[in-house]
């Protein structure tokens, strides 16, 4: 018997389509999986300095640590986030967790009461929606549109605020679109939050995977007077998703958040501490040689694969896509009239069965129309070329029944 609060929780990235792909794999059918942003499975290697730090610290990283995290790790995170312009916080305002995926539910459980509302972008990674549902709160979606390069509209955000709204969440860079929010848009969101006295939550897990010489701006750096929580980690930027290392930074005015902070401390105590061996590499990862940067500059593997898949998708009749500026996802639009698509999950299943390619439909990212899907462009170009060729061939005759 399952608790009622679980009824709305979903994970289409690892949901029914993923389970069908696993069934096919178990039957000996090879599947090209373009559904998860798990760099190591596509041949990406962690920096040598990070590996060496893990080995060197292995004997010292065996006991529980402080509930918020190892002091040395929090000091390194403090210095890093300060370098991005975030002020009004100390190492004691940092909580280290087993990835942002652990910290998001902790945060919303401590923050939200049943019936409270949190503004969440659409499309967006389902972690945050599920965390809101587990807190018995209501996610309210503000739409980001392809025609606007997937940027949020501060006016729409403002129009959705009610007396039950507690916070505005942004995901920057965005998953699944790869959009990067410019300073002027972030400033407008800060102005809305300030006017309505709302907290700002910012998921910035992809902040070190920005391309095209663009700058990632942490929204908390624009709001030193507001209570902000910034989430980040090493899973994606250092290709070590399995190490489970993330953090959240509480900055700005905290006088209004003392009960929330007390709740966070209680929840942190319940899990004792996060992964200590992973914490032992934080200082080296953040302040050592940033070899991961080589992936996202022109000629770098992630950048080249981004350029390829963007062009290949737009060359398929009936598909249009906006060029991602960060992360390793693209969220193309499919002409639903041309292909008679009314159910994007069925489209993904049909593609899986015929071409053995696993994608995630837009439904999995809080997108209310059946006209988008996400592609992970972590595979090498020769693999992406095969996948895009198969997708084009599939769509050349596909019409949903």
Segments and roles (model prediction):
Residues 3, 7-99, 106, 273, ...:
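N-terminal small-domain helix-loop-helix segment of the aminotransferase-like
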Residues 110-132:
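Conserved PLP-anchoring active-site segment centered on the Schiff-base-forming lysine
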Residues 283, 299-310, 321-335:
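Conserved glycine-rich beta-strand-loop-beta hairpin in the small C-terminal domain of fold type I
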Residues 140, 145-216:
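Active-site phosphate-binding strand-loop segment of PLP-dependent enzymes
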Residues 83, 158-159, 340-342, 350-359, ...:
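PLP-dependent enzyme catalytic core of the Aspartate aminotransferase-like
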Residues 221-300, 310-312, 395:
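Conserved core segment of the aminotransferase class I/II
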Residues 133-140:
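A short helix-loop-beta submotif of the ANL/AMP-binding
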Residues 27, 135, 195-196, 226, ...:
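Helix C-cap/helix->beta junction micro-motif
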């Amino acid at each position: 018997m399952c608790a009622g609060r679980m009824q709305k929780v979903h994970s289409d990235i690892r949901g029914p389509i993923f389970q069908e792909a696993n069934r096919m794999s178990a039957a000996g059918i090879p599947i090209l999986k373009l559904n998860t942003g798990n760099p190591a499975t596509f041949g990406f290697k962690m920096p040598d300095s990070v590996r060496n730090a893990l080995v060197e610290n292995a004997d010292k990283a065996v006991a529980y640590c402080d509930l918020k995290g190892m002091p040395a790790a929090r000091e390194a995170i403090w210095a890093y986030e300060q370098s991005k312009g975030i002020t009004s916080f100390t190492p004691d305002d940092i909580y280290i967790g087993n990835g942002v995926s652990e910290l998001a539910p902790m945060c919303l459980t401590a923050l939200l009461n049943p019936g409270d509302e949190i503004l969440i972008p659409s499309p967006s990674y389902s972690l945050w929606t599920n965390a809101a549902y587990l807190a018995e709160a209501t996610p309210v979606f503000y739409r980001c549109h392809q025609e606007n390069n997937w940027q949020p509209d501060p006016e729409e955000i403002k129009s959705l605020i009610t007396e039950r709204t507690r916070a505005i969440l942004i995901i920057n860079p965005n998953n699944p679109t790869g959009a990067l929010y410019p300073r002027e848009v972030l400033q407008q969101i800060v102005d809305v939050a300030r006017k309505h006295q709302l907290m700002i939550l910012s998921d910035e897990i992809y902040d070190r995977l920005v391309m095209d010489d663009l700058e990632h701006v942490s929204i908390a750096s624009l709001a030193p007077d507001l209570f902000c929580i910034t989430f980040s980690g090493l899973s994606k930027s250092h290709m070590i998703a399995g190490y489970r290392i993330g953090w959240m930074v509480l900055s700005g005015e905290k006088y209004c958040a003392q009960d929330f902070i007390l709740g966070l401390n209680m929840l942190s105590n319940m899990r004792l501490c996060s992964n200590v061996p992973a914490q032992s590499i934080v200082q080296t990862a953040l302040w050592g040689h940033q070899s991961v940067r080589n992936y996202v500059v022109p000629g770098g593997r992630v950048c080249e694969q981004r350029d390829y898949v963007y062009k290949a998708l737009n060359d398929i009749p009936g598909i249009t896509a906006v060029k991602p500026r960060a992360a390793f996802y693209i969220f193309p639009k499919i002409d639903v009239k041309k292909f008679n698509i009314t159910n994007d999950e069925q489209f993904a299943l049909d593609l899986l069965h015929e071409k053995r390619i696993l994608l995630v439909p837009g439904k999995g990212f809080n997108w209310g129309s059946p006209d988008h899907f996400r592609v992970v462009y972590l595979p090498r170009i020769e693999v992406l070329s095969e996948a895009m060729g198969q997708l084009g061939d599939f769509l050349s005759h596909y019409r949903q029944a």
